[in-house]
Amino acid sequence: MSNQHILLMSNLLPVGSNISTWWNFGSMLLTCLLLQIMTGFFLAIHYTANINLAFSSVVHILRDVPYGWIMQNIHAIGASLFFICIYIHIARGLYYGLYLNKEVWLSGTALLITLMATAFFGYVLPWGQMSFLAATVITNLLTAIPYLGNTLTIWLWGGFSINDPTLTRFFALHFILPFAIISLSSIHIILLHNEGSNNPLGTNSDIDKIPLHPYHSYKDMLMITIMITMLFITMSFTPNLLNDPENFSKANPLLTPQHIKPEWYFLFAYGILRSIPNKLGGTMALIMSVAILITVPFTHTSHTRSMLFRPLTQILFWTLISTFIIITWTATKPVESPFISISQMTSIIYFSFFIINPLLGWIENKIMMP
């Protein structure tokens, strides 16, 4: 039995002493997941998955159900917090080279894809105008698949258009996928603690480890408290800050807003989709915008794990973050000049990161060890 397992048995999870606040987002994500499951359960009790009643049932939850407005707002704002935490969590993994723990990184990528699917299904459920159009646009992308596209789309819709069967199955999927997220999270954590967490230096932590409790657990509690405080402040003062005004109208297939946009946390992928004037090409780019994370562990060329001592790669990393923000911003704008060209340029820069990064690693190796 290894030293790590002996310490685990005596309730002392060994963790590197120098891990920073960026390592707290895992526990914050777990808190978000628990919040979402609890509030989601209470919302599901009162929700009706029927196109004629769904919108009214959400209004009923907000107006008539005791504390229903709290449940609904925590669930809606909690989803945004969930994505803020997960994007920071992924950025931390990219910056400090944590993707070299391949099993953890790949299980995390699977988690991200499952989470995005769950959030998309959840966005459709209130059956507001933007919910309906987001569902129409995204599910319609299946038709881009050669030969099978139309059949798959009709199969997913449960008919020849988005209708009652579509809403029912989306509700069923939105209910069941969080349990898949719990399972994947467990696998993610088990795989992580198989080797132990890394640290900002990217070196082996074995020589300097301290127990998780009380040293790091109190730090976790502080960040969780700050996050929940932010959640309650937003819920109390600006509960509709992140909602689309179009979604306050019941879905009407005969009306189309000026431009369709999903929730803010999908805007970067939607912006990439929109920047390519071809249905199949756009769909492929949309999938690759997330799936490209799978390639990162296999294209690492630098002798140094962390970006902490790699100034050239740091510039590239912060370019990626800026690009992510710019794509998100352009996706909120109508499809017109100059937003089309900005989207296209930033999309190219976004994907370039994953090509230039291994080349820069190789160049830095030559500079450090000529």
From Swiss-Prot:
It comes from the Eukaryota. One of its GO terms (molecular function) is metal ion binding. It is found in: Mitochondrion inner membrane. Its cofactor is heme b. PROSITE patterns: CYTB_CTER, CYTB_NTER. Its main location: mitochondrion. Binds 2 heme b groups non-covalently. Heme b b562 binds at H75, H174. Heme b b566 binds at H89, H188. It is a multi-pass membrane protein. GO terms for cellular component: mitochondrial inner membrane; respiratory chain complex III. The chain crosses the membrane at residues 25-45, 69-90, 105-125, 170-190, 218-238, 280-300, 312-332, 339-358. Component of the ubiquinol-cytochrome c reductase complex (complex III or cytochrome b-c1 complex) that is part of the mitochondrial respiratory chain. The b-c1 complex mediates electron transfer from ubiquinol to cytochrome c. Contributes to the generation of a proton gradient across the mitochondrial membrane that is then used for ATP synthesis. Heme 1 (or BL or b562) is low-potential and absorbs at about 562 nm, and heme 2 (or BH or b566) is high-potential and absorbs at about 566 nm. Belongs to the cytochrome b family. This is Cytochrome b.
